[in-house]
């Protein structure tokens, strides 16, 4: 089965200079992938020519005449830039011409455009942003929501947990992954009313609910999934990124302080290299917008080509493993109190029809 990925080539801080090389590199590693490169055709072709990939058989260029900048407000992205590379890329998913959309563009605009174009799945009130954060166990903890919903009701947190459970089950091949609810303590009496009520709903659900977890449990790998509202999740994510940068900077400073510390750095280099690979932020680039009728992956805006390629892989894995079908089934089962749930359709996306935007 061929997996087609739509790339918003113009998004992010670096645009085509990052997105196009990442797409071509990904194709060299995955024979069953195809790329739909969306954006300004001349800019895309210039990059392809530099990469000697102008006539690549698994690349299609789809024209978009506008670009959503990192500073554009949501209303501009939705109402004024209707032919933006971001919107056209998301539309490729809606029309079944691609299995996933990858964008490094403006997060607020991407969420708004994706929700407007794709709509939410049946039974899901709000989409959520989910990503993987490295942990001591080596596989990473899936955390959501990371900023899509600053305020949540208890039922939303339950929905987030179900969506993440479905994704982790098929992408990470973990049936019945454990779910933790981020709180200020493990005791059930702790937390605000929303969190306490969410805990009750999770305990009564079919999910493999571990209980309340604290911030340090994310890095311990206490549970496979950690659920929280978007305000808390975004603060946790940004704090993690800041701490990682600070530690890296401090280590570099200490090891370059004198000739002796430089010698120690040379001796410790094998260990430091292994640690750097385990904590490489590029490996964890790409946040999934869960709850939509199609796959959308948000890359970090400042990502380089190596990092953006990991975001492409996240979308590729989700499409190949049928994440949307799994989430659809999970919510169909929950809404079938009056009778047997209808099986969710397997939404494969080989891209059977030509796009009117093809350049």
Swiss-Prot record:
Keyword tags: Cytoplasm, Lipid biosynthesis, Lipid metabolism, Phospholipid biosynthesis, Phospholipid metabolism, Transferase
GO cellular component terms, A-Z: cytoplasm
Subcellular location as annotated: Cytoplasm
Pathway: Lipid metabolism; phospholipid metabolism
One annotated GO molecular function: phosphate:acyl-[acyl carrier protein] acyltransferase activity
Transmembrane feature ranges: none
Catalyzed reactions per annotation: a fatty acyl-[ACP] + phosphate = an acyl phosphate + holo-[ACP]
Taxonomy, superkingdom: Bacteria
UniProt EC number: 2.3.1.274
Statement: the UniProt record of this protein carries the keyword Lipid metabolism: yes
Region called Disordered, residue ranges: 337-359
Keyword Lipid biosynthesis annotated: yes
Gene3D superfamilies referenced in this protein's UniProt entry, alphabetically: Isopropylmalate Dehydrogenase
GO biological process, alphabetically ordered: fatty acid biosynthetic process; phospholipid biosynthetic process
Similarity remark: Belongs to the PlsX family.
Function: Catalyzes the reversible formation of acyl-phosphate (acyl-PO(4)) from acyl-[acyl-carrier-protein] (acyl-ACP). This enzyme utilizes acyl-ACP as fatty acyl donor, but not acyl-CoA.
Record note on quaternary structure: Homodimer. Probably interacts with PlsY.
Protein name per Swiss-Prot or TrEMBL: Phosphate acyltransferase
Organism: Cupriavidus necator (strain ATCC 17699 / DSM 428 / KCTC 22496 / NCIMB 10442 / H16 / Stanier 337) (Ralstonia eutropha)
Highest classification ranks of the organism: Bacteria, Pseudomonadati, Pseudomonadota, Betaproteobacteria, Burkholderiales
């Amino acid at each position: 089965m061929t997996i087609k990925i739509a790339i918003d080539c113009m998004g992010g801080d670096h645009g085509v200079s990052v997105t196009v090389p990442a797409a071509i590199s990904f194709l060299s590693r995955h024979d069953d992938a195809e790329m739909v490169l969306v954006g300004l055709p001349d800019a895309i072709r210039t990059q392809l020519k530099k990469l000697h990939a102008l006539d690549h058989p698994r690349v299609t260029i789809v024209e978009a005449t506008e670009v959503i900048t990192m500073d554009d407000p949501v209303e501009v992205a939705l109402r004024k830039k209707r032919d933006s590379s971001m919107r056209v890329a998301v539309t490729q998913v809606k029309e079944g011409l691609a299995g996933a959309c990858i964008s490094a563009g403006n997060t607020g605009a991407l969420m708004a455009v994706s929700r407007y174009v794709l709509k939410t799945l049946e039974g899901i009130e709000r989409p959520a942003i989910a990503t993987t954060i490295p942990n001591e166990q080596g596989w990473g903890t899936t955390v959501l929501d990371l900023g899509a919903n600053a305020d949540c009701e208890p039922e939303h947190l339950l929905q987030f947990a179900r969506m993440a459970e479905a994704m982790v089950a098929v992408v990470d091949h973990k049936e019945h992954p454990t779910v933790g609810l981020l709180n200020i303590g493990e005791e059930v009496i702790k937390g605000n009313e929303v969190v306490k009520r969410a805990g009750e709903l999770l305990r009564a659900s079919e999910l493999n609910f571990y209980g309340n977890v604290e911030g340090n449990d994310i890095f311990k790998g206490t549970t496979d999934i950690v659920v929280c509202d978007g305000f808390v999740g975004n603060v946790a994510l940004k704090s993690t990124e800041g701490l990682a940068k600070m530690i890296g900077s401090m280590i570099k400073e200490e090891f370059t302080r004198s000739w002796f510390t430089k010698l120690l750095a040379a001796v410790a280099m094998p260990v430091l290299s292994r640690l750097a690979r385990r904590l490489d932020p590029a490996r964890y680039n790409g946040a999934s917008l869960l709850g939509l009728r199609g796959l959308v992956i948000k890359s970090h805006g400042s990502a380089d080509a190596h990092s953006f390629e990991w975001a492409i892989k996240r979308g590729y894995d989700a499409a190949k493993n049928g994440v949307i079908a799994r989430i659809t089934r999970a919510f169909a089962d929950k809404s079938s109190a009056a009778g047997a749930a209808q099986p969710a359709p397997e939404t494969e996306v080989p891209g059977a029809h030509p796009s009117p935007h093809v350049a």
